[in-house]
């Protein structure tokens, strides 16, 4: 199960131009199906990724929701309160990764 979540997260990261929301503070009682059901009210959801902790077997309380359209993502971001399993979760746009700097570049003195 963890391997399939890792493959799904990797595929999601590769789809740079896809509309993806980053969701934090997901209650440990919530499943990806609940996440998909909640966000489907804003637009068609292609997939939801909840990475699991190998040691505990529970998801890590964060995840990604990939929409089929930018409109779905915008609709979700415009909603102020997202409640899943009685808990208010935080929804953000996926931020592009910044280029890594080497240790030599960090030492600017």
Curated annotation (Swiss-Prot):
Cross-referenced InterPro entries: Nucleotide-bd_a/b_plait_sf, RBD_domain_sf, RRM_dom, SLIRP/GR-RBP-like, SLIRP_RRM
Residues of the RRM domain: 19-103
Phosphoserine carried by residues: 15, 102
Modified positions (Phosphothreonine) in chain numbering: 101
Keywords assigned by UniProt, alphabetized: Mitochondrion, Nucleus, Phosphoprotein, Repressor, RNA-binding, Transcription, Transcription regulation, Transit peptide
Pfam families the UniProt entry points to: RRM_1 (PF00076)
Tissue: Ubiquitously expressed, with highest level in heart, liver, skeletal muscle and testis.
Annotated Gene Ontology cellular component terms: acrosomal vesicle; mitochondrial matrix; mitochondrion; nucleus; perinuclear region of cytoplasm; ribonucleoprotein complex; sperm flagellum
Gene Ontology MF annotations: RNA binding
Keyword Cell division: no
A GO BP annotation: negative regulation of mitochondrial RNA catabolic process
UniProt xrefs under SUPFAM superfamilies: RNA-binding domain, RBD
Compartment list: Mitochondrion; Nucleus
Primary role: RNA-binding protein that acts as a nuclear receptor corepressor. Probably acts by binding the SRA RNA, and repressing the SRA-mediated nuclear receptor coactivation. Binds the STR7 loop of SRA RNA. Also able to repress glucocorticoid (GR), androgen (AR), thyroid (TR) and VDR-mediated transactivation.
Identification of the protein by name: SRA stem-loop-interacting RNA-binding protein, mitochondrial
Source organism per UniProt: Homo sapiens (Human)
